[in-house]
């Protein structure tokens, strides 16, 4: 029942807007919430489904999109990063690709702009998790947004959008679990969700996974505006608390990846004797890039408050990823979390 309801919700115009005229490529493994539930939606509406197999590199995906005339594709940002590099290398304009759905982690603004300006492809930002089967929200603009400029629309598209009919979301005060916060777009708190395809309990466990009043706490920190658009600030476990003030790792990563000489970046908390935690950036340079630590740190200077600017940039050859393409920040914290303490002793 829950899968059928979610499939109906996912196919709606304000969701994926899928029909029998579409050709869909989910670049998401079947072990990850059944490829985000897309095979069920495709079967329901008669959409052609193209499965990528083991070839998840940019060149293979570019060839698949061009050969099968894919109209909509889904994946995490690291997948699209490889696709954009490959499409540019082979001079493909991806002419049939009209919509790409990005979830799993926040889409960098520069990536969304590239899809829009270079490939005339609409990016649909989405949010969900295994416990939400996974559909939690999708970003489709409202009619009142039509009059906005492209850059103003982009700022709205960078949010995770609105929940479809069938689920509800709310935010609660971070320190006091069930104190509901206003939907003013500014007040942040714990993102909680409930609905027809949301978890009740984990497999093999008798106790409920929900709060006393029936909501599932997602572990995300977010704001919700008056139109219901969710804007994820961070995973609660990835927030950086420096001197009692919160710093969003997502915001720092988006800034770093907006630099043309950076291919990938992760922001993590490093232990600091005075401030408890300070942000540092772990980054991979773009091909043939000669960027320095000082150059990247200066890039932050006019974009955020001075106290939010990372203390260090550490360049690496690779960043560990999960099987679904998400950065393994736990591993990065274990490897680099003491780097500021080490620099004090040297």
Regions found by a protein language model. Name each.
Residues 68-70, 91-93, 141-145, 283:
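Short, hinge-like loop/turn segments at secondary-structure boundaries
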Residues 335-346:
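Acidic/polar alpha-helix N-cap and adjacent early helical turns
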């Amino acid at each position: 029942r829950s899968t059928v309801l979610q499939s109906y919700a996912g196919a709606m115009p304000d969701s994926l807007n899928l029909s029998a005229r579409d050709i869909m490529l989910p670049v998401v493994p079947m072990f990850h919430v059944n490829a985000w539930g897309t095979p069920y939606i495709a079967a329901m509406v008669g959409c052609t489904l193209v499965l990528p197999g083991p070839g998840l590199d940019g060149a293979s995906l570019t060839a698949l999109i061009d050969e099968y005339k894919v109209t909509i594709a889904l994946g995490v940002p690291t997948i699209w990063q490889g696709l954009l590099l490959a499409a540019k290398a082979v001079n493909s304009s991806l002419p049939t690709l009209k919509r790409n759905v990005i979830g799993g982690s926040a889409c960098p603004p520069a990536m969304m702009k590239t899809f829009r300006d270079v490939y005339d492809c609409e990016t649909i930002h989405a949010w969900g998790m295994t416990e939400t089967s996974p559909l939690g929200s999708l970003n489709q603009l409202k009619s009142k947004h039509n009059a906005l400029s492209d850059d103003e629309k982009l700022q709205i598209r960078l949010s995770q959008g609105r929940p479809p009919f069938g689920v509800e979301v709310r935010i609660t005060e971070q320190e006091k679990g069930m104190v509901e916060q206003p939907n003013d777009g500014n007040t942040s708190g714990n993102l909680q969700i409930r609905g027809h395809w949301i978890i009740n309990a984990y497999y093999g466990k008798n106790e409920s996974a929900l709060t006393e009043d029936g909501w599932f706490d997602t572990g995300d920190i977010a704001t919700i505006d008056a139109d219901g658009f969710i804007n994820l600030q961070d995973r609660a476990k990835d927030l950086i608390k420096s001197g009692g003030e919160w710093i969003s790792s997502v915001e720092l990563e988006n800034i770093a990846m907006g630099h043309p000489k950076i291919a990938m970046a992760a922001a993590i908390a490093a232990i600091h004797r005075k401030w408890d935690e300070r942000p540092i950036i772990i980054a991979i340079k773009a091909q043939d890039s000669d960027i320095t630590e000082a150059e990247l740190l200066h890039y932050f200077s006019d974009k955020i408050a001075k106290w939010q600017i990372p203390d260090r940039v550490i360049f690496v050859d690779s960043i560990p990823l999960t099987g679904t393409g998400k950065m393994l920040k736990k591993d990065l914290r274990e490897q680099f979390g003491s780097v500021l303490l080490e620099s004090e002793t040297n």
